[in-house]
Amino acid sequence: MAHFLLRYTLAPDYLERRGALREAHLALAWAAADAGTLILGGAVGDPPESALLLFTDSAAARAFAEQDPYVTEGIVTHWDVVPWATVAGVDAATPIRP
């Protein structure tokens, strides 16, 4: 299984604005998880400065971002999708052992 990271840069006022959007964002995230395309996701930092969402498919990651109210309402200021070459761990896409 391939891995792709959806990387979000969050607006400085993210915490103040996310409340009104969080339910719709989480509904979208859990729908993607239930569909099997989203593995994990969450904010990074305390306070949050970015977010990472791990997907099994790059097209699904892009589609998620394009629909995400955090993106459409501007509390995500930049996003991109990058392949993640996972090599260690039980769910590594390409396990490499010494």
Protein language model regions, located:
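Conserved, structured core segments of small domains
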Residues: 1-98
